Amino acid sequence: MAKEKYDRSKPHLNIGTIGHVDHGKTTLTAAITKVMADAGYSEASAFDQIDNAPEEKERGITINSSHVEYSTEKRHYAHVDCPGHADYVKNMVTGAAQMDGAILVVAATDGPMPQTREHILLGRQVGIPRIVVFLNKVDLVDDEELLELVEMEVRDLLSFYEYDGDNGPVISGSALGALEGDEKWSKTVLELMEAVDTWIELPERDVDKAFLMPIEDVFSITGRGTVATGRIETGVANTGDPIEIIGMGAGKLTSTITGVEMFRKILDRGEAGDNVGILLRGIEKSQISRGMVITKPGSVTPHAKFKAEVYILKKEEGGRHTPFHNNYRPQFYVRTTDVTGTISLPDGVEMVMPGDNLTITVELIQAIAMNQGLRFAIREGGRTVGAGQVTEILD
């Protein structure tokens, strides 16, 4: 049977709901899918489908998160919702769910709470460019002045963390009301999505950068050759393009792309963000393995020394029970593989406690394909003890 093509007619964005526990993030996520389904754009996802978030492992860290998809008139969205606060912290630092923008949910009954602040700060640290606010549960607040006060507080908080608190949209509504089909509240969700469509800009996609895909798995298909699977990090893979395969400090291989597949469908091309299988001409399965990267020839250089912003897991999150000191030597899990490296702490920092967030310098024992913004996990004996991203390359 001929494979159908994947529809790319609407621009795609990754967003997520953030905010304090029990402020209505999951209810809002379900309400958006319902309202958009009623408008004829996509299918609904039920609350318990979203709330029953599966565990995922990203860079060895266990994260619970639910992914739903829906469309508006203008765009197609992949939306991530996390049940627990620690899941958000880990999700954002590891880049498990790369967000192009976020919907901050604040219950009008409570106003901004500690996690509201933490999520905004995290959004700033990991580079979420814009935030739209949904003031939830306004059906439970009779006092108009109280609503205005809460909105002012949220705007001040956004401005404090260098978001545009003055001009950013704040939509008031009731996620539960919309989920229950009350037209008055469904309209507020439509209004929210219009705000998301206009305020959250289409990111400058990584499509324009040079092609790079870390290899996750390798198969050989009888009669067709070797297929490498993975998520395209940057650029575009076209059938017929020449490529290089760069190993860990090893020599490089050259080949040509003979086909690209996604969701069991044939594509003319794969682009940044797509999970694809790439058919490689003249490459034996034994020559390539997980941890190598496929790139546009000459586009990536290997590096071993860099500065990074890191989060060290707490004991309760499965991290270390004790602090570590200068010259600590863990493994760095980068893209799809581990490399040993030595950590140098900033001047004046004697030790790092579980739960800390700081800037460190790292020197790896072998150079790997590296770029600024590259994310990694820090591991010790197969156990993840931290996560971070490269902020500056030093060699």
UniProtKB/Swiss-Prot annotation:
Record-given protein name: Elongation factor Tu
Location of the region described as G4 in the Swiss-Prot/TrEMBL record: 136-139
Taxon lineage: Bacteria, Pseudomonadati, Bacteroidota, Flavobacteriia, Flavobacteriales
UniProt keyword annotations, A-Z: Cytoplasm, Elongation factor, GTP-binding, Hydrolase, Magnesium, Metal-binding, Nucleotide-binding, Protein biosynthesis
Binding site for Mg(2+): T26
tr-type G domain ranges (all copies): 10-204
Listed InterPro entries: EF-Tu_GTP-bd, EF-Tu_GTPase, EFTu-like_2, EFTU_2, G_TR_CS, P-loop_NTPase, Small_GTP-bd, T_Tr_GTP-bd_dom
Annotated region (G3), positions in chain: 81-84
Amino acids binding GTP: 19-26, 81-85, 136-139
Enzymatic reactions: GTP + H2O = GDP + phosphate + H(+)
Gene designation per UniProt: tuf
EC category: hydrolase
Similarity-based family: Belongs to the TRAFAC class translation factor GTPase superfamily. Classic translation factor GTPase family. EF-Tu/EF-1A subfamily.
Region G2: start-end pairs: 60-64
A GO molecular-function annotation: GTPase activity
Enzyme Commission numbers on file: 3.6.5.3
Primary subcellular site in the record, as a coarse category: cytoplasm
The protein's assembly and partners: Monomer.
